Amino acid sequence: MSSKTASTNNIAQARRTVQQLRMEASIERIKVSKASADLMSYCEEHARNDPLLMGIPTSENPFKDKKTCTIL
């Protein structure tokens, strides 16, 4: 009985592996040079909206202290 269960598990695992490989084989692929050029273009187009590059205006910064510390 144990041998039959192990065999069934192996078959199920093999089917899952084949299904995964078929899915991965159907994915459209592009060359790294094209992907990197597209990524650089996207970054350049959206750089003006990136708060890490442009900074956040102090009037819109929700984390900036509204008042100074009175203890010091």
UniProtKB/Swiss-Prot annotation:
GO terms for molecular function: G-protein beta-subunit binding; PDZ domain binding. PROSITE patterns: G_PROTEIN_GAMMA. SUPFAM superfamilies: Transducin (heterotrimeric G protein), gamma chain (SSF48670). The modification Phosphoserine is found at residues 3, 26. The modification Phosphotyrosine is found at residue 42. The modification Cysteine methyl ester is found at residue 69. GO terms for biological process: G protein-coupled receptor signaling pathway. Signal peptide: none annotated. It is a lipid-anchor. One of its GO terms (cellular component) is heterotrimeric G-protein complex. A lipid is attached at residue 69 (S-geranylgeranyl cysteine). Keywords: Acetylation, Cell membrane, Lipoprotein, Membrane, Methylation, Phosphoprotein, Prenylation, Transducer. InterPro entries: G-protein_gamma-like_dom, GGL_sf, Gprotein-gamma. It is found in: Cell membrane. Present in all tissues tested. It is not sure whether phosphorylation by PKC is on Ser-2 or Ser-3. The keyword Membrane applies. Residues 70-72 form a propeptide. Transmembrane segments: none annotated. Guanine nucleotide-binding proteins (G proteins) are involved as a modulator or transducer in various transmembrane signaling systems. The beta and gamma chains are required for the GTPase activity, for replacement of GDP by GTP, and for G protein-effector interaction. Belongs to the G protein gamma family. This is Guanine nucleotide-binding protein G(I)/G(S)/G(O) subunit gamma-12.
